[in-house]
């Protein structure tokens, strides 16, 4: 069985329509943050009822968020997806990212001066204890999705806040509006960048697997030429990809691991910290 994350927006509604005849269950999260939230939920409910599709809904109300709302919302969303995934014994979760998302994510990474192992978003990966599949990531641009929905007369909701430049992704997205040729050039550039990283990625994965087999011991880590990459993968795996590491932070972590001083822990964020326990590197929850 496949789990499909459906917000009620155009991308996920097309994804749902494409897979409606498969063995699926739908998960919808309503944050009740926008006036149109109930409308989006009803769109998903109506479609699933009409097509006899299993639907699980998480309704979040009366909450206070300290810090970044998007980080908080992402954690709530994926915690819920994991529960549904396990309840129905799913083999993968489908997400509706498309080519525009691929380009936007790359530009966000560049803006934040990040140097990831893989630029932008992978079509398939394993995270949060789930097999994640993004069928549209190299298939459709946003304008193509909208045309298909129009032709098939599929209802969807538009998030009115997407037009507001209150978040970095919104600013990048709105700046790329009607710049189709530029988007295509950037898309091709990302594919080339990732292609030339493949050999290095394979070697890094070998080093990481070897380090993992040794229970993440300090000595094996220090032998690797790819310490920055190993730290990125290690932290991502241990925190369910909930921490965005800057290069400066990665260097601080490496310095902490290398240090012979009696430093007990390295704070990663409000939820996680790193420790050196008997020459073994561990990530623990507070």
Swiss-Prot record:
GO terms for biological process: tRNA modification. Its main location: cytoplasm. Pfam families: ATP_bind_3 (PF01171). The keyword Cytoplasm applies. ATP binds at residues 7-12. It catalyses: cytidine(34) in tRNA(Ile2) + L-lysine + ATP = lysidine(34) in tRNA(Ile2) + AMP + diphosphate + H(+). Its EC number is 6.3.4.19. One of its GO terms (cellular component) is cytoplasm. Ligates lysine onto the cytidine present at position 34 of the AUA codon-specific tRNA(Ile) that contains the anticodon CAU, in an ATP-dependent manner. Cytidine is converted to lysidine, thus changing the amino acid specificity of the tRNA from methionine to isoleucine. HAMAP family: tRNA_Ile_lys_synt. The N-terminal region contains the highly conserved SGGXDS motif, predicted to be a P-loop motif involved in ATP binding. This is tRNA(Ile)-lysidine synthase. It comes from Mycoplasmopsis pulmonis (strain UAB CTIP).
